[in-house]
Design a protein with these regions (language model features):
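Short amphipathic alpha-helix that is part of the acyltransferase structural core
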Residues: 1-34, 47, 51, 154
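A short helix-loop-beta-strand connector motif used in the catalytic cores of GNAT acetyltransferases and
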Residues: 37-49, 79
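Conserved beta-hairpin
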Residues: 45-61
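Conserved beta-strand in the GNAT
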Residues: 56-66, 79, 84
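A conserved beta-turn-beta hairpin within the catalytic core of GNAT-like acetyltransferases
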Residues: 66-80, 90, 139
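Conserved acetyl-CoA pyrophosphate-binding loop and the N-cap/start of the following alpha-helix
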Residues: 89, 93-101
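Conserved active-site alpha-helix within GNAT-family acetyltransferase domains
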Residues: 108, 112, 119-142
Length: 154
């Protein structure tokens, strides 16, 4: 099994997986090339992909660093943008492993809270230590979950 951090979303393994992910969600994209170009313009977003020796993508997680601030406070958060595991590999721990990669990345980069939205897998995220945030509202109206990150011993 291979795990790779990517910042270039023209990666063919990532692109094939992302297309499959959107297909599962029923999202139609008229110009994939433009979508991946737009992703590459966002220099704050990275992804981790997990694949086998046949370059079959097991899953990916796409994350972004963001800062919540006002006139008095400023706090960085790690935003879990997308998490997807290929149906063939679900329920085998790959989603949790991808989440761990993202959380370790955040922690090593001085980000100690992770935030995400989900309408499809709240129990999965709760098992990983995420808690529903009553005061935080997402623009997509999905429930928001936050986790205080701790140093992870490997």
């Amino acid at each position: 099994m291979i795990e790779e951090q990517i910042t270039d979303f023209s990666n063919s393994i990532f692109q094939a997986a992302f297309k499959q992910y959107f297909q599962e969600l029923g999202i139609i994209v008229s110009d994939w090339e433009d979508l991946f170009k737009q992703m590459n313009k966002d220099k704050e977003t990275i992804a981790f992909i997990r694949y086998n020796n046949n370059n079959d993508c097991i899953g990916f997680i796409q994350v972004k660093s963001t800062i919540f601030s006002d006139d008095f406070f400023k706090e960085p958060y790690g935003f879990i943008r997308e998490l997807w595991v290929n149906k063939k590999y679900r329920l085998c721990g790959h989603g949790a492993a991808l989440m761990k990669l993202a959380e370790e990345y955040f922690y090593k980069n001085g980000i100690y809270k992770s935030i995400l939205t989900t309408s499809t897998a709240p129990e999965f995220y709760k098992k990983l230590g995420y808690e529903f945030s009553f005061g935080c509202k997402a623009k997509n109206n999905d429930p928001v979950y936050i986790k205080q990150l701790k140093l992870i011993e490997s």
